[in-house]
Amino acid sequence: MIITQTSHCYMTSLGILFLINILPGTTGQGESRRQEPGDFVKQDIGGLSPKHAPDIPDDSTDNITIFTRILDRLLDGYDNRLRPGLGDAVTEVKTDIYVTSFGPVSDTDMEYTIDVFFRQTWHDERLKFDGPMKILPLNNLLASKIWTPDTFFHNGKKSVAHNMTTPNKLLRLVDNGTLLYTMRLTIHAECPMHLEDFPMDVHACPLKFGSYAYTTAEVVYSWTLGKNKSVEVAQDGSRLNQYDLLGHVVGTEIIRSSTGEYVVMTTHFHLKRKIGYFVIQTYLPCIMTVILSQVSFWLNRESVPARTVFGVTTVLTMTTLSISARNSLPKVAYATAMDWFIAVCYAFVFSALIEFATVNYFTKRSWAWEGKKVPEALEMKKKTPAAPAKKTSTTFNIVGTTYPINLAKDTEFSTISKGAAPSASSTPTIIASPKATYVQDSPTETKTYNSVSKVDKISRIIFPVLFAIFNLVYWATYVNRESAIKGMIRKQ
């Protein structure tokens, strides 16, 4: 009996201890129990743990679950190797482009760089769904699990899809099966250039894209918003230093090859070169060199060293300018507008040098009565031939009258400046003798040396006038051509 009571008390104690341990807030001594790692208690942010929180319906969790099931169902049995509507209809891919930056343009490589958001839209009946949302934003990873157009750029040398920090791709699925696929691309594309009008040239740089494998019987392309609004360039998107972006023209082409016909979407960006750099670098130096070469016409023709330096220096300068002007251009086989200008300037400079050589070699020296005095020996003209007198007398007799002769010691003649009055010694002196009579004539005028050539006088007028006419025709021609091209682009 005692053993039975003892066992009963022992079992009662164990039950009490068990109840105390399972109570959440107390210990055996009535103090609060410390938190164990596995318990869920009230968090610092004020939220309740799932264990103690009331049952609140989570719509986002339900939507995620719903769309997960929708995607799993859509991709179940989906074959991304087959295009939409295979065997029934042609797949239409609508495209549009937003240009974030345009440039730079390389003249030597004949290419340009463009950064775009490239958007494609198409319809896939296999991806229709019913759900709480009409448009389902998707991760770019899903793009590898569905069919996407095999679009490529016909004139692209290199295209880069941006992947920082993740692939810059956007994919949206509408409940009717329409997909929007957007990528950010940097494209290096060819730009054929015709440089006959350089540097007043205008270029149309194309951007062409289309399907690589699907012909027009399978896939066709069209512009999403029409030809006028499907290509947009950001207002601050120009990265051009030497060009102005005049506008763009959108179109569609059909190309034919041995494998069939393909649709090609085209956009031509019209560029006008800025001429300011070339005016400062080439045109003004050429004009100044030509003017400098014509200064030699105003120098005396006896100034051989000075005029030679003018001619040779200007010719060498034009040669240097013509070489440097070609460095920024591709090595084309035809002459550009700048080449023609430099060639004409070179001809003017070289002609000035040839003109001096002609004047110096062929033109005879002319004499005039003005300018610098050059002494000449006076000529003795024998009026009456007779035998010379044997004895010099200090007197001579004219009609029975005797006159003394005043003989000067210095027989040289001094230079007489213009306008000086003749002296008494300049009058004719008659030397008389019984047998001979001589008359010595002194010049009443003195001759001067004149270095001005008639060819120089003509060149001073002809060369500047011809050069001015050439510039007038040259600039008027290219300015009018530029205006006509701009008007044509606006009409398009």
UniProtKB/Swiss-Prot annotation:
Modification Phosphothreonine, positions: T427
Residue numbers spanned by region Disordered: 28-54
Family: Belongs to the ligand-gated ion channel (TC 1.A.9) family. Gamma-aminobutyric acid receptor (TC 1.A.9.5) subfamily. GABRA3 sub-subfamily.
Extracellular side: 29-274, 326-336, 479-492
Residues involved in 4-aminobutanoate binding: R119, T182
Annotated transmembrane regions: 275-295, 306-325, 337-357, 458-478
Signal sequence, start to end: 1-28
Disease the record associates with this protein: Epilepsy, X-linked 2, with or without impaired intellectual development and dysmorphic features: A neurologic disorder characterized by variable combinations of epileptic seizure, and a varying degree of intellectual disability and developmental delay. Some patients have dysmorphic facial features or mild skeletal anomalies. In general, males are more severely affected than females, although there is evidence for incomplete penetrance in both sexes.
Residue list for modification Phosphoserine: S426, S433, S442
Catalytic activity: chloride(in) = chloride(out)
A GO biological-process term: inhibitory synapse assembly
Record note on what altering G47R does: Found in a patient with autism spectrum disorder and no epileptic seizures; uncertain significance
Record-annotated disulphide pairs: C191-C205
Gene Ontology MF terms in the entry: benzodiazepine receptor activity; GABA-A receptor activity; GABA-gated chloride ion channel activity; transmitter-gated monoatomic ion channel activity involved in regulation of postsynaptic membrane potential
Known glycosylation sites: N63, N163, N176, N228
UniProt domain comment: GABAARs subunits share a common topological structure: a peptide sequence made up of a long extracellular N-terminal, four transmembrane domains, intracellular or cytoplasmic domain located between the third and the fourth transmembrane domains.
Activity regulation, free text: Potentiated by etomidate, propofol, pregnanolone and flurazepam.
Name under which the protein is recorded: Gamma-aminobutyric acid receptor subunit alpha-3
Originating species: Homo sapiens
Assembly description: Heteropentamer, formed by a combination of alpha (GABRA1-6), beta (GABRB1-3), gamma (GABRG1-3), delta (GABRD), epsilon (GABRE), rho (GABRR1-3), pi (GABRP) and theta (GABRQ) chains, each subunit exhibiting distinct physiological and pharmacological properties. Binds UBQLN1. Interacts with GPHN.
Coiled coil (UniProt feature): none
Cellular-component GO terms for this entry: chloride channel complex; dendrite membrane; GABA-A receptor complex; GABA-ergic synapse; plasma membrane; postsynapse; postsynaptic specialization membrane
